[in-house]
Amino acid sequence: DISAVAKMLKLKIPVSVSREFSGDFDVFAFGGNSFDQDECAKAKNTAETCYGPRIGLAIMVLDPKKASSALRIWEKTMSSDLKPLILAKAGGSATANFQTGTYQSQSIRYKNMPINTITVEYALSDDILIITTSKSAILKAIDSLPAQSIQETTPATEPAQ
């Protein structure tokens, strides 16, 4: 049960998001790579936590449109709510708001932390929600998706403020 795992990891996932979870999920680890290690070296950060392992979640969702809308609203607190997934001392955010990027026609929402090897990122591909704590980890997770899951997606519109 993803709710039990979230509780065990001390993650705060809003009910508006978790009610869209189907129950099928995976927790995975990305071991880091030389790109991240080089980026940390440029920033004069030699701590292994700067470039080391990252934890991610892959969660099946019931209704991708509802999940997308709920995720956009969650962005306001997502970084702090998922802080236990970040295995490094990241400090505050480098960007005030989430931004959108694209990889293999897949829309990715992300928020950078002070070091660009540490982020909070998510992508919704068909009915699979991927949440990671580094750019490298989400790209690797997208590469691992079945080919039919990778399709051009349009992010939900910003909720009214």
Annotate each language-model stretch with its function.
Residues 1-96:
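Structural boundary/hinge residues at secondary-structure and domain interfaces
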Residues 23, 27-32, 100, 105, ...:
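Intrinsically disordered, low-complexity regions enriched in small/polar residues
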Residues 28, 98, 144-147:
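Non-transmembrane interaction and regulatory regions of membrane-associated proteins
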Residues 68-120, 153-161:
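Short Gly/Thr-rich strand-loop-strand
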Residues 106-146:
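A short, solvent-exposed beta-edge/loop patch
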Residues 139-143, 147-160:
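Extracellular glycan/ECM-engagement signal in secreted proteins
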